[in-house]
């Protein structure tokens, strides 16, 4: 269910703003989006897994908060990020 270290490194490389950037909102949102996609696939076969569903809602809320922050600070970066990730908004 969790993302592999290689996939996480690839996401960091793709969305980083600088060479060693791992904490920018873009990177965090990309990693959260990957985790959300994995959990969504999990629920296709495990529909009654309510403990994990609570974790999914927490991840979605965290991603929403980061996106709101990014929209407040720099709307251009926000727009390009949601287009790259294919997030509805």
From Swiss-Prot:
Q: Has the keyword RNA-binding been applied to this entry?
A: yes
Give the function comment from the record: One of the primary rRNA binding proteins, it binds directly to 16S rRNA where it helps nucleate assembly of the platform of the 30S subunit by binding and bridging several RNA helices of the 16S rRNA. Forms an intersubunit bridge (bridge B4) with the 23S rRNA of the 50S subunit in the ribosome.
Which source organism?
Answer: Methylobacterium sp. (strain 4-46)
Extract the InterPro entries matched here: Ribosomal_uS15, Ribosomal_uS15_bac-type, uS15_NS1_RNA-bd_sf
Quaternary structure, per UniProt, is:
Part of the 30S ribosomal subunit. Forms a bridge to the 50S subunit in the 70S ribosome, contacting the 23S rRNA.
Q: Which gene encodes it?
A: rpsO
User: The organism sits in which domain of life?
Assistant: Bacteria
Protein name as catalogued: Small ribosomal subunit protein uS15
What GO cellular component entries does it have?
Answer: cytosolic small ribosomal subunit
* MF terms in GO: rRNA binding; structural constituent of ribosome
Please state which protein family the record places this protein in. Answer: Belongs to the universal ribosomal protein uS15 family.
One Gene Ontology term of the biological-process aspect is: translation
Keyword ATP-binding assigned: no
């Amino acid at each position: 269910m969790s993302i592999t270290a290689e996939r996480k490194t690839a996401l960091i490389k793709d969305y980083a703003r600088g060479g060693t950037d791992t904490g920018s909102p873009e990177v965090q949102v990309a990693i959260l989006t990957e985790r959300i996609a994995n959990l969504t696939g999990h629920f296709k076969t495990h529909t009654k897994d309510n403990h994990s569903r609570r974790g999914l809602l927490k991840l979605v809320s965290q991603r929403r908060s980061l996106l709101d922050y990014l929209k407040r600070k720099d709307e251009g970066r926000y727009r390009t990020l949601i287009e790259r990730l294919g997030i509805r908004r």
